[in-house]
Amino acid sequence: QNARIAVVYFAGY
């Protein structure tokens, strides 16, 4: 469920 947010968070890291 938080996979999409995790990807965006990681990409913005």
UniProtKB/Swiss-Prot annotation:
User: Required cofactors, per record?
Assistant: FMN
Q: How is the cofactor bound?
A: Binds 1 FMN per monomer.
The signal peptide, as residue positions, is none
Answer yes or no on keyword Flavoprotein. Answer: yes
Keywords assigned by UniProt, alphabetized: Flavoprotein, FMN
User: Induction: what does the entry report?
Assistant: By phenol.
According to the lineage, what is the superkingdom? Bacteria
User: What family does this chain come from, according to its entry?
Assistant: Belongs to the WrbA family.
What is the protein named?
Answer: Flavoprotein WrbA 1
Could you tell me which species this protein originates from?
A: Acinetobacter calcoaceticus
Q: What is the lineage of its organism?
A: Bacteria, Pseudomonadati, Pseudomonadota, Gammaproteobacteria, Moraxellales
